[in-house]
Amino acid sequence: MSDFHHISVMAAEVIQYLAPRAGGIYVDGTLGGGGHARQILEASAPDGLLIGFDRDREAIAIAAERLAPYGERVRLVQRNFACLAETLDEMGIDAIDGFLLDVGVSSHQLDTAARGFSFQHDAPLDMRMDVSSGQSASDLVNTLSEADLARIIWDYGEERWAKRIAAFIVKRREESPIETTMQLVDVIKGAVPRGAWDVRLHPATRTFQALRIAVNDELASLEKALAAGVRFLKKGGRGVVISFHSLEDRIVKTSFRSFAQGCTCPKSIPRCVCGKLPLVKVITGKPVMANEAEVSMNPRSRSARLRAAEKI
């Protein structure tokens, strides 16, 4: 089990902006291999509490093994981070000092062929972060209407050839179900005109991203977790989010700005009647990006964007 690998992105920056301290209560909404969690525990020694979430039971198991030396300072939960509010309520915790969300798929999930996240390996077309529940990517591509497939591929993948890819998927599944990653890759390659292939981007990249987001309801989960995290933050507590593509980053940016906004009454009204007060101040004017040294060691960090906000 110890072969679970996931390189913690922007580790120093996470600690800088989260600013963990002794006695604090911190939530890591995306445990992965436990790298960020371990750093938070070290920075909040000797008595900081870490509550870790992950949908992936393999990630939970390896995190439990790796974080065992921290004993009762660690509580692990196999749940979507969208369940943050109800989980904290169940634990009797009414406020936290910080939360971290490192969203998207982990290096381990991408590199484990059997999980079906990658277009580089032939495997069952699954893509579920929690393999014990929900519909797989294969279920979606074989049952959704052409219009729904096109909408998902466009909305979640920002793929310009979404309609054509959806049409090719429907045509192909009429012959036999699309059950593996390479079967889907072949369909996509046939749908996207070769002259439109980007030398820097595999033609299946955006479609695979879109299906993964749809299978795991990632964007709605992110919005829900952000709202809950900000609500539970103590004054001075911080939320840190690392995203890897524009859809996620847009949600984080918009959410933090909304939480930082006060009165929304029209300017024509002389006195505020909405009663809305700012909840946070955004402490990253622009998204923080991985430095050149990190990108050279971990190319996947190139697309990482970190944003942070502090409760006021």
Swiss-Prot record:
Keyword flag Transferase: yes
The entry's keywords: Cytoplasm, Methyltransferase, rRNA processing, S-adenosyl-L-methionine, Transferase
Localisation per UniProt entry: Cytoplasm
Cystine pairings recorded for this chain: none
Record EC number: 2.1.1.199
KW Transport (keyword) present: no
Family: Belongs to the methyltransferase superfamily. RsmH family.
This protein's name: Ribosomal RNA small subunit methyltransferase H
